[in-house]
Amino acid sequence: MMIKPKQRILSAAETGAAAACCRTSPDQEESHVFEQIRNFAIGALGAAMLAGAPQAHADGLPGLRGHDHTGITVPDIKQATDFFVNVLGCKSVMSFGPFSDDKTTFMHDLLNVDPKSVIHQITLVRCGYGSSIELFQYSAPDQKNMTPKNSDIGGHHIAFYVDDIKAAKDYLDSKGVKTFFTLPVKEGPAAGQTITYFLAPWGLQMEIISYPQGMAYEKTSPIKLWSPTDPGK
């Protein structure tokens, strides 16, 4: 991700240069931010090139290797990071920001947000095996504060694989986390999995899932879903 630091105004030529090579600024603090982003981009590219996973179908996105991360906008990034780290047990890897540009359409052109939007902070966390989670705290003139339900267009949830659903649910309950009904799936291609939904303190929908004996679809499908129980496949 290439995002211009707060109060930094780029010309069209500078924007192109920054996107191409993460150009540093003479200002020390600004240079440090760009260095973080440059290193992140180079690391991600190197990981993709060296990964041993098979490439996607030839008719798909060229060079596709897999799901790198999911971005989630939260109302309070300190609260969100605390929940992911101290309740769920994820690891906070890096944070950077703020970013804004209230003089041009840079933020809209890059991220499809209001041009006067501000990203106050970005924090990336890693939760065991699997893709990373990127947390954003924004402010914007047109910001909506309604969290979508699973039934809404754009509704979403994050699911975590656990070894023991009951133990995980009991733990969440002990932490005061809102949990829902536990469902063991016994029919259909998903038979073998057990799920429980829960809510983060700010309303983000999440799930714990377990299928220690696998799922029914695996007996007939030539393609297997990725699973943190066997991350190499």
Language model features by range: what are they?
Residues 7-9, 27-42:
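Bacterial N-terminal signal peptides that target proteins for export
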Residues 10-20:
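Intrinsic, low-complexity polybasic segments
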Residues 21-22, 56-63, 67-75, 94-95, 121-137, 146-172, 194-199, ...:
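Vicinal oxygen chelate
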Residues 41-52:
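Bacterial N-terminal signal peptides
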Residues 62, 73-130, 167, 174, ...:
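Core segments of cupin and vicinal oxygen chelate
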Residues 100, 140, 212-214:
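A short acidic/small-residue loop/turn micro-motif
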